[in-house]
Design a protein with these regions (language model features):
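Helix-to-loop junction immediately C-terminal to a conserved catalytic motif
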Residues: 6
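Conserved ABC ATPase "signature" region
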Residues: 21-22, 63, 70-88, 140
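Short coil-to-helix segment of the ABC ATPase nucleotide-binding domain corresponding to the Q-loop/switch region
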Residues: 52-59
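Conserved ABC ATPase signature
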Residues: 92-96, 100-102
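A short, proline-enriched helix->beta-strand linker immediately N-terminal to the Walker B motif
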Residues: 111-115
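ABC ATPase "signature
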Residues: 177-178
Length: 182
């Protein structure tokens, strides 16, 4: 689903509306701008660059945008503090726990200050205690940052815990949409 929203996979039909604009109508340049400036992605498998430090991983979206090294490292340091990884900026992914790696992935998605976050099962690879802790941190952070988030999960309890509106899908089709209470 998230790969369809940002058109990494081309949908066969329908519309994808972001800010009342149909992403299906975007040309290549407009689509690239959407991906680089408006959408941040958090992946299930962390997708960190092993040859880059934590700070460089976080700063990567800003590097792609052409932001100066000093400005992107300043921004990355601020986000590092927000995700509670102060002091870990010079470490590499293999030196971090799974929960810490996922925090780096979230920090990288937030570094470019996107309007939208696409999160593809971001906590599913983590043990239950770390998963619960990161869910709590995400809830707190989402209240602070005020980002529209599409959070994909196969865990209904997680959806109810972190979601404001939930869409339940079966066989690729939405079968129900509502609030957690509904």
């Amino acid at each position: 689903l998230v790969r369809h929203i940002n058109r990494l996979l081309e949908p066969t039909s329908g519309k994808i509306l972001i800010n009342d604009q149909d992403v299906m109508q975007f040309n290549k340049d407009h689509l690239q701008e959407l991906r680089n400036k408006k959408i941040g992605m958090v992946f299930q498998n962390f997708a960190l660059m092993p040859h880059r430090s934590v700070l460089d991983n976080i700063a990567m979206p800003l590097e792609i945008r052409g932001v100066s090294k000093n400005d992107r490292l300043d921004a990355a340091n601020k986000i590092l503090n927000i995700v509670e990884l102060q002091g870990w900026g010079n470490k590499y992914a293999h030196e971090l726990s799974g929960g810490m790696q996922q925090r780096v992935g979230l920090a990288r998605a937030l570094a470019a200050d996107p309007e939208f976050l696409l999160m593809d099962e971001p906590f599913s690879a983590l043990d239950p205690l770390i998963r619960r802790q990161l869910q709590s941190e995400f809830i707190k952070l989402s209240k602070q940052m005020k980002k529209t988030t599409v959070f994909i999960t196969h865990d209904l309890d997680e959806a109810v815990r972190v979601g404001h509106r939930i869409a339940i899908m079966r066989d690729g089709a939405v079968v129900q949409i509502g609030t957690p209470e509904e």
